[in-house]
Amino acid sequence: MTTEATALAYKVADITLAEWGRKEIEIAEKEMPGLMATRRKYAGQKPLKGARITGSLHMTIQTAVLIETLVDLGAEVRWASCNIFSTQDHAAAAIAAAGIPVFAWKGESLDEYWWCTRQILEFEDGKGPNLIVDDGGDATLMIHLGYKIENNPELLEKVPGNAEEKALYQQLREVYSEDTQRWHKVAAEMKGVSEETTTGVHRLYQMMEKGELLFPAINVNDSVTKSKFDNLYGCRESLADGIKRATDVMIAGKVVVVLGYGDVGKGCAHSMRTYGARVIVTEIDPICALQASMEGFEVTTMEDAVGEGNIFVTTTGNKDVITLEHMKQMRDEAIVCNIGHFDNEIQVEQLNSFAGATKLNIKPQVDKYTFESGNSIYLLAEGRLVNLGCATGHPSFVMSNSFTNQTLAQIELWTKEYSIDVYRLPKELDEEVARLHLGQLGVKLTTLSKEQADYLGIPVEGPYKPDHYRY
């Protein structure tokens, strides 16, 4: 059941959860020094005054701290989650109770999800956003696809390829029936988007290469203080949290197959090994495969690993990396989950439509599929993000890194004029984000002397590494 206020001020699961949410937000603020320092730094300046920000990013306690930071800096904000299972209902309630429009609840249908995304793109007096905080690119996609449809209405006749596409097109049909130039007007006022995750960044670069990108974008994901912290250290803790909350399984002694060894895969593989699992990695990239092997992981193909694994984790950002055929070949009681952004890494639709499997829901976000052979598998979070679907996502401290980058990116886009392209935050800001988090960990930095800095050919105060340095 959802609760709706007049004029669509919010739609959340239960507004009475707001007090609980507020208590957890206050705890999270103590663990998010970067965001709180950014609030203090810009308190008198209000650098986002006049900005209308659409946020499509997991509606968690940590995100609530980001939202209130953007509001503190002067922005008008509307928010929805970027995943049907990732909302923490008490966090959404707290934000709604604070008077910030939010449209999010845990367990949305796909139709509800795209309805929520539409709501956050509709401000008062018919206006749209002029900035977007995106995670996975769905808010950006809705504008771009709507824009294409206005140029070629025949696209509305397209037969949807899947249930998600069907839900998205239904919303776009309704918008087009109300205003045939809605998305052109929205795009004309957009100053830019800052994108949180690898999948969304891929979408942006693809649009840029095709000449379809309508406004500037900042790739927050590839800031060092995001990708090397959130993706790596965040997953290192939250993957195990999701698996254990969902299944209570003992990880020690199990065989865990991690598909992909990018930053997310690295965090997952090291996490599972720390728990005592034997970890097998699959990879397409020879560099990542060599890294995994040099770290002591067995690297092989899914075809070779499928009969060995007790737990399978997809981390690739690609589609169909675990197929229906793979799942049919898995050991009895294997656990299958995904920590990449979208659910198409695992062939969930094919599994659900397969007549040779019987589905039994064990509890929310845990489903057992029994095949004709008698073997069963457990699918977590319906193939969506296991750490957010079955747990509460990354810890506050590491999200402070990511969200400080997001805040700085929004300030950059709002206060400066960027041409249409995909950018990264400058190295100085990356280092500043890191610096803001050192004090809480008791870190003391060594300071270069002028002579040492001159010897290295860098400023005393940094930046200390060239842009091509990989960390």
UniProtKB/Swiss-Prot annotation:
As recorded in UniProt, its EC number(s) are: 3.13.2.1
The GO cellular component terms are: cytosol
UniProt binding sites for substrate = T60, D135, E196, K226, D230
Q: Where in the cell is it found?
A: Cytoplasm
The residues that the entry says bind NAD(+) are: 197-199, 231, 260-265, 283, 318, 339-341, 387
Q: In which pathway does it act?
A: Amino-acid biosynthesis; L-homocysteine biosynthesis; L-homocysteine from S-adenosyl-L-homocysteine: step 1/1
Q: What class of enzyme is it?
A: hydrolase
UniProt GO MF annotations? adenosylhomocysteinase activity
| Reactions mediated catalytically | S-adenosyl-L-homocysteine + H2O = L-homocysteine + adenosine
What binding details are noted for the cofactor? Binds 1 NAD(+) per subunit.
Which GO BP terms apply?
L-homocysteine biosynthetic process; one-carbon metabolic process; S-adenosylmethionine cycle
Q: Which UniProt keywords apply?
A: Cytoplasm, Hydrolase, NAD, One-carbon metabolism
Which cofactors, if any, are listed as required? NAD(+)
| Similarity annotation | Belongs to the adenosylhomocysteinase family.
Its job: May play a key role in the regulation of the intracellular concentration of adenosylhomocysteine.
**Could you identify this protein by its name?**
Adenosylhomocysteinase
Q: Which organism is it from?
A: Chlorobium limicola (strain DSM 245 / NBRC 103803 / 6330)
Taxonomy of the source species: Bacteria, Pseudomonadati, Chlorobiota, Chlorobiia, Chlorobiales
